[in-house]
Design a protein with these regions (language model features):
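Leucine-rich repeat
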Residues: 86, 106, 130-135, 156, ...
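Conserved LRR concave beta-strand detector
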Residues: 77, 97, 107, 121-123, ...
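A generic tandem-repeat structural signature
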Residues: 106, 113-208, 212-215
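Terminal targeting and flexible regions in eukaryotic proteins, enriched
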Residues: 1-82, 94, 102-104, 118, ...
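A structural signal for leucine-rich repeat
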Residues: 90-92, 111-116, 133-142, 159-165, ...
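WD40 beta-propeller repeat blades
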Residues: 207-212, 217, 221-262, 266, ...
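Consensus "Asn ladder" position of solenoid repeat domains
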Residues: 83, 103, 124-127, 150-153, ...
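Plant-biased, solvent-exposed loop and capping regions
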Residues: 59, 65-70, 76-77, 87-89, ...
């Protein structure tokens, strides 16, 4: 009986090879399907176990493509990273996490993920992806996708049709210069947006509608001003290494959730900072290092960490930290960095000790 089954399988193989083109990808696809389409079960007849092939009419079941690993300990994950792949392999329907980073992939065609609607995590970073070679409906049938990693590629624009389910989007270290207003439309679940190290000059109103966004990273771009229409729930804003020279007066007062602001390595001057722009009680950390400041800006007594190193500050003004100095009024500042300025220890007035009594780290 076993001999007849083997003969039948060989006959099928010969028939396939004579009727199909010799294209290597077709042959590889055939081998994959043959390797994984035969699931065997046990049936009992007269207390004797026997193996039987499942019905040939059933569709093939592909547990894992040959190019990847799908470890039994992580049954919903597919690892295809660091394999010199030039295309996205077939993704089985049960997969939720697919890792395709560190390959040579340049193109993503429409339909490549359609078989896996439960995908929640796609890592495609550190490839050679080109915006012109990404289909406009690649992500159209992924209603459960939450995290998408596209950093370290050759993207010149935001891909079309991003799922509204996304919570974490990484597109840093690309060549994106402009972001159309509709790029993130309807993405009300997005909480973290990473756009650092691109060539963005202006975001316009592209961030409107991102009601859940709490982290926005725009480091290393070409921004000349702080983006307008910042989301209301934003708590972390990273703008270092840009070309920003001024700050709007209501920049922080209209965004009570903003806790951490980093504006180092810009072109800020005291003339571009309104008197009370940073004097808001909700701010926890402010980084203004490596700018062109000559005076310490006025800050709230609630601020805990202030970084002002590598500016041109010549004077230590206690009133920048405490409007009134006594036993009941003092700053909550813990960390103050003023090194690489023009202030000397003897320039600090004695009342500064009372004002900054909670500080544990002051660098001059």
């Amino acid at each position: 009986m076993k001999g007849w089954i083997l003969l039948l399988m060989l006959a099928r193989l010969v028939d396939f090879s004579m009727t199909q083109p010799t294209n290597s990808l077709t042959w590889l696809s055939y081998l994959r399907n043959r390797a994984y389409s035969h699931a065997y079960g046990r049936s009992h007849n007269n207390n004797h176990a026997s193996l039987r092939a499942e019905d040939e009419d059933e569709p093939p079941v592909l547990d894992c493509p040959l190019e990847c690993d799908c470890p039994p300990s992580y049954p919903s994950a597919m690892y295809c990273d660091n394999r010199q792949l030039q295309h996205v392999p077939f993704v089985p329907s049960h997969i939720k996490y697919v890792y395709l980073q560190n390959n040579q992939i340049t193109t993503i065609t429409n339909g490549v993920f359609d078989n896996a609607p439960n995908l929640a995590w796609i890592s495609l970073h550190t490839n050679k992806l080109n915006s012109d070679k990404i289909g406009d409906k690649v992500f159209a049938k992924l209603p459960n996708l939450q995290r998408l990693f596209l950093h370290n590629n050759n993207l010149s624009r935001v891909p079309q049709g991003l799922p509204r389910s996304l919570r974490d989007l990484h597109m840093n270290h690309n060549n994106i210069a402009k972001i159309p207003v509709e790029s993130f439309r309807g993405m009300s679940n997005l909480t973290a947006l990473h756009l650092q190290v691109n060539a963005i000059e202006d975001l316009g109103n592209a961030l409107q509608g991102l009601q859940s966004l709490t982290l926005l990273d725009l480091r290393g771009n070409r921004l000349k001003k702080i983006p307008e229409s910042l989301p209301p729930m934003l708590s972390q804003l990273y703008l270092k290494y840009n070309r920003i020279s001024s700050v709007p007066a209501d920049f922080l007062s209209q965004r009570p959730e903003l806790r951490f602001v980093r504006l180092s390595h810009n072109q800020l001057t005291n003339g571009g900072i309104p008197t009370n722009a940073f004097n808001v009680s909700t701010l926890v950390e402010l980084d203004l290092s490596f700018n062109k400041l000559e005076r310490i800006p006025t800050i709230s007594t609630s601020l805990e960490n202030l970084y002002l190193q590598a500016n041109k500050i010549k004077e230590f003004s206690v009133s920048s930290f405490c409007r009134v100095v006594d036993t009941n009024n003092y700053s909550n500042l813990r960390v103050l960095r003023l090194d690489a300025n023009e202030i000397r220890a003897q320039d600090i007035p004695t009342e500064a000790v009372l004002c900054l009594r909670l500080a544990t780290n002051i660098d001059l």
